[in-house]
Amino acid sequence: MTRIAGINISDKKHILVALTSIYGIGISLSKKICFSIGIRCDVKINSLTKEKIESLRSIISKFLVEGDLRREKTINIKRLMDIGCYRGLRHRKHLPVRGQRTKTNARTRKGPRKLIKSR
Protein backbone atom coordinates (compact mmCIF):
# COMPACT_ATOMS: atom_id res chain seq x y z
CA MET A 1 0.00 0.00 0.00
CA THR A 2 1.39 3.33 -1.08
CA ARG A 3 0.23 6.46 0.70
CA ILE A 4 -0.38 9.50 -1.52
CA ALA A 5 -2.27 12.63 -0.37
CA GLY A 6 -3.33 10.88 2.84
CA ILE A 7 -4.94 7.94 1.01
CA ASN A 8 -3.69 4.36 0.97
CA ILE A 9 -3.51 3.23 -2.65
CA SER A 10 -3.38 -0.44 -3.59
CA ASP A 11 -0.11 -1.52 -5.21
CA LYS A 12 -1.86 -3.99 -7.51
CA LYS A 13 -3.84 -1.37 -9.45
CA HIS A 14 -2.75 0.45 -12.57
CA ILE A 15 -1.65 4.00 -11.83
CA LEU A 16 -4.44 5.51 -13.95
CA VAL A 17 -7.13 3.81 -11.87
CA ALA A 18 -5.29 4.07 -8.56
CA LEU A 19 -5.03 7.86 -8.70
CA THR A 20 -8.80 8.17 -9.18
CA SER A 21 -9.32 6.79 -5.67
CA ILE A 22 -8.16 10.21 -4.44
CA TYR A 23 -11.11 12.61 -4.09
CA GLY A 24 -10.73 15.34 -6.69
CA ILE A 25 -8.72 13.34 -9.22
CA GLY A 26 -10.59 11.79 -12.13
CA ILE A 27 -9.47 9.89 -15.19
CA SER A 28 -8.51 12.96 -17.23
CA LEU A 29 -6.47 14.56 -14.44
CA SER A 30 -4.85 11.20 -13.75
CA LYS A 31 -3.77 10.97 -17.40
CA LYS A 32 -2.31 14.50 -17.25
CA ILE A 33 -0.36 13.66 -14.10
CA CYS A 34 1.05 10.48 -15.66
CA PHE A 35 2.00 12.36 -18.82
CA SER A 36 3.75 15.14 -16.88
CA ILE A 37 5.87 12.64 -14.94
CA GLY A 38 6.54 10.49 -17.98
CA ILE A 39 4.86 7.32 -16.77
CA ARG A 40 2.76 5.06 -19.00
CA CYS A 41 -0.83 4.70 -17.77
CA ASP A 42 -0.79 0.88 -17.71
CA VAL A 43 2.06 0.66 -15.18
CA LYS A 44 1.18 -0.72 -11.75
CA ILE A 45 2.03 1.21 -8.60
CA ASN A 46 4.35 -1.47 -7.18
CA SER A 47 6.65 -1.22 -10.23
CA LEU A 48 7.27 2.52 -9.71
CA THR A 49 10.54 3.71 -8.20
CA LYS A 50 10.73 5.82 -5.04
CA GLU A 51 11.63 8.89 -7.11
CA LYS A 52 8.55 8.50 -9.33
CA ILE A 53 6.30 8.12 -6.28
CA GLU A 54 7.84 11.23 -4.71
CA SER A 55 7.28 13.18 -7.93
CA LEU A 56 3.67 11.93 -7.92
CA ARG A 57 3.24 13.23 -4.37
CA SER A 58 4.75 16.60 -5.23
CA ILE A 59 2.51 17.09 -8.29
CA ILE A 60 -0.66 16.00 -6.45
CA SER A 61 0.15 18.34 -3.55
CA LYS A 62 -0.24 21.27 -5.97
CA PHE A 63 -3.89 20.34 -6.64
CA LEU A 64 -6.86 20.89 -4.35
CA VAL A 65 -7.74 17.32 -3.30
CA GLU A 66 -9.33 15.35 -0.45
CA GLY A 67 -10.15 17.34 2.72
CA ASP A 68 -9.23 20.73 1.29
CA LEU A 69 -11.52 20.22 -1.71
CA ARG A 70 -14.40 18.97 0.47
CA ARG A 71 -13.96 21.97 2.79
CA GLU A 72 -13.90 24.38 -0.17
CA LYS A 73 -17.10 22.81 -1.52
CA THR A 74 -18.98 23.11 1.78
CA ILE A 75 -17.80 26.71 2.24
CA ASN A 76 -19.10 27.61 -1.22
CA ILE A 77 -22.50 26.05 -0.50
CA LYS A 78 -22.66 27.77 2.89
CA ARG A 79 -21.82 31.10 1.23
CA LEU A 80 -24.72 30.64 -1.20
CA MET A 81 -27.07 29.94 1.71
CA ASP A 82 -25.83 32.96 3.68
CA ILE A 83 -26.35 35.48 0.88
CA GLY A 84 -29.87 34.14 0.34
CA CYS A 85 -29.70 33.63 -3.42
CA TYR A 86 -31.99 31.19 -5.23
CA ARG A 87 -29.39 28.42 -5.31
CA GLY A 88 -28.76 28.87 -1.59
CA LEU A 89 -32.48 28.61 -0.83
CA ARG A 90 -32.71 25.40 -2.87
CA HIS A 91 -29.76 23.96 -0.94
CA ARG A 92 -31.38 24.95 2.35
CA LYS A 93 -34.67 23.23 1.40
CA HIS A 94 -32.84 20.11 0.14
CA LEU A 95 -34.28 20.47 -3.36
CA PRO A 96 -32.58 20.22 -6.76
CA VAL A 97 -30.52 23.31 -7.48
CA ARG A 98 -30.09 23.28 -11.25
CA GLY A 99 -33.66 23.69 -12.46
CA GLN A 100 -34.85 20.09 -12.50
CA ARG A 101 -38.54 19.34 -12.04
CA THR A 102 -39.70 18.37 -8.57
CA LYS A 103 -43.36 17.42 -9.02
CA THR A 104 -42.71 13.77 -9.83
CA ASN A 105 -38.95 13.24 -9.75
CA ALA A 106 -36.09 14.42 -7.47
CA ARG A 107 -36.53 11.59 -4.97
CA THR A 108 -32.77 11.31 -4.52
CA ARG A 109 -32.42 14.91 -3.40
CA LYS A 110 -35.68 15.09 -1.42
CA GLY A 111 -35.19 11.77 0.33
CA PRO A 112 -37.77 9.04 0.88
CA ARG A 113 -41.45 9.91 0.79
CA LYS A 114 -43.02 11.13 4.00
CA LEU A 115 -45.94 8.91 4.94
CA ILE A 116 -49.27 10.61 5.53
CA LYS A 117 -51.45 8.96 8.15
CA SER A 118 -54.77 7.76 6.78
CA ARG A 119 -57.95 9.04 8.35
UniProtKB/Swiss-Prot annotation:
Record-level GO BP terms: translation
Residue span of region Disordered: 96-119
GO CC terms in record: cytosol; small ribosomal subunit
GO molecular function: rRNA binding; structural constituent of ribosome; tRNA binding
Subunit structure comment from the entry: Part of the 30S ribosomal subunit. Forms a loose heterodimer with protein S19. Forms two bridges to the 50S subunit in the 70S ribosome.
PANTHER family noted in UniProt: 30S RIBOSOMAL PROTEIN S13/40S RIBOSOMAL PROTEIN S18, SMALL RIBOSOMAL SUBUNIT PROTEIN US13M
Protein's job: Located at the top of the head of the 30S subunit, it contacts several helices of the 16S rRNA. In the 70S ribosome it contacts the 23S rRNA (bridge B1a) and protein L5 of the 50S subunit (bridge B1b), connecting the 2 subunits; these bridges are implicated in subunit movement. Contacts the tRNAs in the A and P-sites.
Protein family (similarity comment): Belongs to the universal ribosomal protein uS13 family.
Protein name: Small ribosomal subunit protein uS13
Organism: Buchnera aphidicola subsp. Cinara cedri (strain Cc)
Gene: rpsM
